[in-house]
């Protein structure tokens, strides 16, 4: 990969078409917990607008930490406690059993979904709840059930109700159409936020999940915008001469770390959104870019070629002398802190391939997490269990997800063209 690819702030993204992303599971986890997810009983008396059982089953399988039992292997289809023969499920090697049913109230047009999770060995109910909503909320309810089951089984909060942002490009002859889109974490229900004929790059979620910062070249030069995801209202926050790129939010949502070349060289700055004041963090002849705030807001990781090639450095958010973090290999870029701040994820070049890697900040131990070859733009799920990134598959740009601990893998290709620049949202109240 040529050196200019390191400068993702000026990268022109290759193309794709607007559509929901389609999940392709590449590899499961051998250590996944077996859970029998029984098809919910349709007690509504009419066809459901969505197969809610399929929604949360696919969510759980995609996590890599839970392995739902194949429906064809189920010996019965219980929907409530008195219909369960726990011995049968134990013989099938299942540790948990999820049952439930769906009712529909025609006058109010509201669905009521009942679910219960049981420990097969103890035969005790672990969780149980009734949730309700209209037909357009069935997918949300499915994701909510997956979140609840995942947390009950693993002890980790689920991320199935979160969202992802990404950039697509539709090519039609010599014409390019770039789109900034937001979808559910499973790639469904995509929504177009911005459509332009010039590149859009570097989307970044605000900590409350209500806004996206990004770079648009729509005025023939890069400028940084902040856009409200729900209303579409947007504000241009920087448009200096030269580069305006790589925005990333501070944990409290009041600042953006950005890369600007307004003074002649690409340096890191902190923009205070409350008063539009700028503070310069770096001052070096090299290119400093791709900042990432630590969860406590005290440290910023960034990419710099001040050592002769792209490497990861750390600098105090209040300023000071940067210190080099990566030494293994000639190319390390696009750092992202783990949720607990103990690791940094980044793109590492080894044996001609560009892979997502992790570096333990205490031990200094690094680990390659992916086996694809042209990985870019890692973004961490808010529970820290998965990383979404951009890569190539069969000559197309796709999004891919890898389980940090489970090693599970799946891809999210667009139905047409390419997709790039993923950003996983924080937890969102909806």
Swiss-Prot record:
Q: Does the keyword Transit peptide apply?
A: no
Q: Tell me the GO BP annotations in alphabetical order.
A: cell division; protein import
Tell me, in one coarse class, where this protein mainly resides: periplasm
Query: What Pfam families does the entry give?
Result: PD40, TolB_N
Protein's cellular compartments:
Periplasm
Signal peptide residues on this chain, from the entry's feature table: 1-19
**Keyword tags:** Cell cycle, Cell division, Periplasm, Signal
Q: Which PANTHER family does UniProt cross-reference here?
A: PROTEIN TOLB, PROTEIN TOLB HOMOLOG
Homology family: Belongs to the TolB family.
Subunit structure, per the record? The Tol-Pal system is composed of five core proteins: the inner membrane proteins TolA, TolQ and TolR, the periplasmic protein TolB and the outer membrane protein Pal. They form a network linking the inner and outer membranes and the peptidoglycan layer.
Q: What is this protein called?
A: Tol-Pal system protein TolB
